[in-house]
Amino acid sequence: MKINALSEKRETEILRRLEEAGFEGYFVGGCVREAIRKEMAQTADRKVTPGGCGEESPREVITDTDIATDARPEQVKAVFHDMTVLDTGIKHGTVTVLFHADELRTPEDPAEDVNMENQGSRIPVEITTYRIDGKYGDGRHPESVQFTSSLEEDLARRDFTVNAIACDRHGELTDPFGGAADIEARIIRAVGDPEQRFREDGLRIMRALRFAAKLGCDIEPGTSEALSVCKGLLADISAERIYSELCKLVTGKSAGDIVRKYTDVLGVVIPELLPMKGFAQNNPYHRYDVLEHCVRAMEVVETRSDNAVYMKLAALFHDIGKPETYSEDENGIGHFYGHPSVSCRICRDIMNRLHADNFTKDRLCRIVKYHDLVFEKDRRLLKRWMNRFGAGVMLEILEIKKADNFATGNMEESLKVKFDEIRQMMEQILDEQQCFSLRDLAVNGRDVIAAGIEPGPEVGRVLKRLLADVIDEKLPNDKDVLMDNILTEN
């Protein structure tokens, strides 16, 4: 199998220079995996659409490029003596070479082919010597490494077969563990003994789940069993590393399947998920238990690239307080009074524990706390809510509300239409720049003072009264009208 996506990259010039110096050089790791996925998708598209005009998938751009070589770090430095070389991981055989775009031009490239906008920027490329890892004393890094001249020995130390593939500058693969076949079959499989791989670095447990979620893969049975056996290792992994993998996991296309199947594994780092599984809601409005309901909401919630993490987490956690607030009435119907506030508290505990950034934590908790907000097709009510929460938060709460209702399993089409119409109303308010906040008001504090109001708290009270009247459409948002109102009402 030949991978054109890599053989056409400018970084092949790095491999050429290593080869000219008498060394081997290969692309390795994620860039090879993504290039194979891209190549397979294009092949499938050509089969579906003769002439190769089908839509390209996957959409990911291959950016990070890692290179492995039999050259020792000092030899790599000598080969690239005319470049900037950083000792980014010299203990483990890694140096980073910084290239200018024009330095990656091959001899066959005309000078004008170089993108002039990129000539001032530097492209970092990690180059690592083939190695065999020693014992992992800290569950993250090998205590020692032994350099080797064998590419296969280097690939054997890697986590999963899909990441244990090398590609030369002509696009030809070296794939001793069947990684390309696993990519095609959508299987995540550990290289060698899965338990050993996970005990070397416990974060690989989260990485397995993340790759399966992102790539839409099943986890090979032996690897899957090892996940459960070794799950306790996650307790010793830093919160920041866990959180980074969790964010990638929940935004994956198969995140729901992974959360369902590996709740016990994720429960090591988020134990609050465990009571949700199998917790019957005993309510005719809900068809599923609490966890299944939340997972379904996570699967269907609409997101953007800039809010996907906290929206997916909000959907997954929005009812996490239900087990704690459950009660039954005299008819045996389940109720969860106050669960949004409890869910918000639990969310904050989780995000604090995972050392999440403040913006994500606060936005997530705000959405969860108010996910039961009542929405009506009332422009004035919507503007009041938009004033209180902000337009962006309101649109996100609406999306969570829509996903929440869909995930009951009993959502009627009329309710979906209602939510869509409410969204259109809010977007119209924004598009028409209708006034719903003090910053939109046609008058400000200086105008109120100019109208004769003494500086102080009364200025704020007047502005809030005017805003309320404008939102309720008792007054137009016109400066002359509002100034007259100040003069007559005060």
Task: Give residue spans per PLM region.
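Catalytic cores of the polymerase beta-like nucleotidyltransferase superfamily
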Residues: 1-490
